A protein has these predicted regions:
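Helix-to-loop junction immediately C-terminal to a conserved catalytic motif
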Residues: 58
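Conserved ABC transporter NBD signature motif
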Residues: 66-78
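Short helical segment in ABC ATPase nucleotide-binding domains corresponding to the A-loop/adjacent helical element
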Residues: 99-108, 118, 122, 226
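Conserved ABC ATPase "signature" region
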Residues: 114-133, 185
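Conserved ABC ATPase signature
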Residues: 137-141, 145
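A short, proline-enriched helix->beta-strand linker immediately N-terminal to the Walker B motif
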Residues: 156-160
Length: 279
């Protein structure tokens, strides 16, 4: 069976930024495809360029070489078809209520009336379990609740791709685990397309169904893994721990030529939509 064309294509993208002393290459010729309803995770150590890559997909950074395409059209700037959830708690306007924070983005698109925007905002808040806090202000919310508002605001925009840049990194371990579960519950309801950045191997396996490994700086593709077999309930299993250890070796210990010995195939464009999960 042939597959549909990818929704998002990152084609040999190299990204650079200027420091005080020199130009730094963040990623080098990174290539991957994301299909509709994928939960695609970019996993790598700090400084590998994964957040910069997410910003390039969002349209905030222009590639030095290569191209990013959404639905076959080149990404040339930000747009409502790609919405980002960051890790910072201060991404909400503190002078607006929870509902007003969600409505603000909807009204900015100039496609919905005030009543329509309010209705969609309430629908999104219900999806993340915050109906009872619609009139609350951000300073009264916990960190996890603020991130749920940010997710509700993003999903209310109905983007083609939801971009999440280490959204739970600043949360305590218990809240982070619950937020991971809630993202998966929302995905089961809505089947949105997710591009998720993390430096946590365990989080990547729980959240993603496909995981792209990026090498230490500058970020280059090491391998792509199929993580369909894993989820919150499998985190303590032997297979989960063995896979996490294998990923660690791929990221830090093994040269590129040793990928095959780790039983993980290097990234290649798939001929079929489904792939076998790692043993």
């Amino acid at each position: 069976m042939t597959i549909a064309a990818p929704l998002l294509q990152v084609d040999n993208v190299s990204l650079e930024y200027a420091s005080a002393q020199r130009v730094v290459r963040a990623t080098h010729r990174v290539r991957f495809d994301v299909h509709a309803a994928d939960r695609f995770v970019l996993l790598g150590p700090s400084g590998c360029g994964k957040s910069t890559l997410l910003k390039a997909v969002a349209g905030f950074v222009t590639p030095r070489e290569g191209q990013i395409r959404l639905d076959g059209a080149a990404v040339t700037g930000p747009g409502p078809d790609r919405v980002v959830v960051f890790q910072e708690f201060d991404q909400l306007a503190p002078w607006k209520t929870v509902r007003e924070n969600v409505v603000f983005g909807l009204r900015a698109t100039r496609t919905l009336s005030r009543a329509e925007a309010r209705e969609r905002a309430d629908e999104s808040l219900a999806q993340v379990g915050l109906t009872g806090f619609a009139d609350a202000y951000p300073h009264t919310l916990s960190g996890g609740m603020k991130q749920r508002v940010a997710i509700a605001r993003a999903l209310a925009m109905r983007p083609r791709v939801l971009l999440m840049d280490e959204p739970f990194a600043a949360l305590d371990a218990l809240t982070r685990a619950r937020m991971q579960e809630q993202v998966l519950e929302l995905w089961e309801q809505l089947h949105f397309t997710l591009l998720f950045v993390t430096h946590s191997i365990e989080e990547a396996l729980v959240v993603g169904n496909r995981v792209l490994l990026l090498s230490p700086h500058p970020g280059q593709v090491r391998a792509e893994l199929n993580a369909h077999a894993f989820g919150p309930q499998s985190a303590g299993s032997v297979a989960f721990q063995q896979t996490a250890q294998r990923i660690h070796r791929l990221l830090f210990d093994l040269p590129d030529a040793a990928l095959d010995d780790a039983k993980v195939a290097p990234l290649r464009r798939p001929a079929v939509r489904q792939r076998e999960a790692l043993p």
